[in-house]
């Protein structure tokens, strides 16, 4: 009898209710089983989830459900990264309070995530804008302040004069504010900083312990930390060229071996010498102001056009008093890095070469590539940056660059310049302290108080939390906290006099730098419960986009170490395993030059070609490239629409099945339809065979077709488990397709009443295995299938969500036959399939029976047959 079609809408709502009523996924910290903590990067509540969220959280859910089935006590929580500028922008544009906007979005997105059937412990949910959360963050801030890990200092920042706020380097686009479009200014502001540089060496060394992280991410962090070993060299200014009070410039270089290729010295626009020279020099002042219009990051400097201003000053070469180098103020040197001054060697640094060509400076190669002739070697448009031997470098000629480095360092360390060594070896880091001050309302208030008499002091712990006031106005740019009539006025905790609150709020990256620790005991009054934190941390598997490779992941690594110093955790690293998934991408479509949504078009096959037209008008639509889903290009697929049309399981299955998880997955309607057909096929096969299998005890077959069924199922259990352990979800999905194909004929026999007792036992076991293996990917379908089979696994009533992972029999997984390549005179001619335990004589006899061997021997006998056990056979004719 044909089964009714599977109805995902009904089944998914039912099983989600069952899981919730049974509190199936709530985690007990006191559970004695081995722990496993799986976490996906928590979302910003922008309004609705997108398909990227579906893929990210589906992957995490597969891991959580699998590990739960393997007997682990799994922590799989969810929360909201809820502070940030978009809420304030919405407040200004839509006249809605950031708090209201944020919590409305959280409610919508929580409903959407619940509709996915994720095995989340919602009892631990929090939003970073919850007072209860940022209260503990303020406690942490004060703890770190008292440990000397928080400081306040002036710093160059990107200032948006329209929005009246500091912008992160990433928010400066072509010199303009990403939202206002205003030309960004560099300003010196007093800011709060976390002293991440105290941990530079630790953060770098710790990368070597993270063997379950992608090498690409570790390399990105290694480069961002940017440890370099170099030489700090004092260069004397040529007499008569420098202003009074200046006699030298100190440069930092990682390539002192190339000093004989030097063509210029470049100093920062903020170097004391540049500032002095700009007094009364309108042209230089104008150039310095232009330098201040670009971003403050190294990345911004590296991408900007290289410009310089010749100061007329000269410095003496450290090895030749008669050799003078011009000094430029340059827009690619930052005062905060090194000494704010560098020497340029155009032949062996691309930036220096571009600069030298622009200003017609001499280019002298001093490193000769292997195989080149020193007399004829020259530099064209590309600098030579690899190894070689030194040339044009006097006493360094013939040395390797490494040897030349040490020779230069040794000589200059021994050379006296005005009573001090002319050079010292120095280790530098690119990493800079983390400025966390933001001139924004919707963030965690910094718990500090400013008093003219007593200075700056922390808010007393008894007065925490410092709550954001609700009665603020968003009628103009800037920080509403600065304008609040009462909130910023407070009494000094030391003298009792009038004082003011800190009105800057914390960078939202602070909120996400410790949330994984809060999930371990979110009900505690202290930021963490040390016992719970030490039990659960580090996170065993963290999943999120590679766009967070540096900032979020590096800040989290710092914060874990800082919290350890403050006594809140006992680990150094927050995330043991890291997986960075690919994006969900989609075709783009245009009609009349405008982007159009996939929901508004029809695509048909006409004469073998895909043709798109508008649904409403029939107008032709241009099918464009496949790109990341974005609202601007309207190639977004709404998960709500997919779940309403196909069900959550199909959305999950598709994003897991179509591509390796680290690569992008292309969303297609055809792919979703294919997943839908597969779901219906599984349901039909199980539901139609269920009456014959419901009361049968599972038992592996021992012979014939029943043995084949059991072998296929047991092999799949081993393989799918291995695939999930490796996060190779697409391979696991492919194996389940194969297993369904293998079982389909036998299941149909059972449905038709044609299966014998042994086959029924084998099918009952194999079908249970199929259901349990499908469960991490398609949990609702799995529950519905098991219910159809009587709700039992191995004879015991259970939910699939609480059932153990099936156990394979090693004897059924081992192949009894092997395929051996057969060579004739060293060239492969075919294969031999034979019993794995066949002896050498049996193999030799079987080889002689092969048609292609008989043909090659032409009635004769071989000189010999060489058998390499389990590997290969070679017939010498």
Swiss-Prot record:
Signal peptide: none annotated. InterPro entries: aa-tRNA-synth_I_CS, aa-tRNA-synth_Ia, Leu-tRNA-ligase, Leu_tRNA-synth_edit, M/V/L/I-tRNA-synth_anticd-bd, Methionyl/Leucyl_tRNA_Synth, Rossmann-like_a/b/a_fold, tRNAsynth_Ia_anticodon-bd. It is found in: Cytoplasm. Keywords: Aminoacyl-tRNA synthetase, ATP-binding, Cytoplasm, Ligase, Nucleotide-binding, Protein biosynthesis. A motif ('HIGH' region) lies at residues 43-53. Pfam families: Anticodon_1 (PF08264), tRNA-synt_1 (PF00133), tRNA-synt_1_2 (PF13603), tRNA-synt_1g (PF09334). Its EC number is 6.1.1.4. PROSITE patterns: AA_TRNA_LIGASE_I. A motif ('KMSKS' region) lies at residues 628-632. It catalyses: tRNA(Leu) + L-leucine + ATP = L-leucyl-tRNA(Leu) + AMP + diphosphate. ATP binds at residue 631. GO terms for cellular component: cytosol. The keyword Kinase does not apply. GO terms for biological process: leucyl-tRNA aminoacylation. GO terms for molecular function: aminoacyl-tRNA deacylase activity; ATP binding; leucine-tRNA ligase activity. Belongs to the class-I aminoacyl-tRNA synthetase family. This is Leucine--tRNA ligase. The gene is leuS.
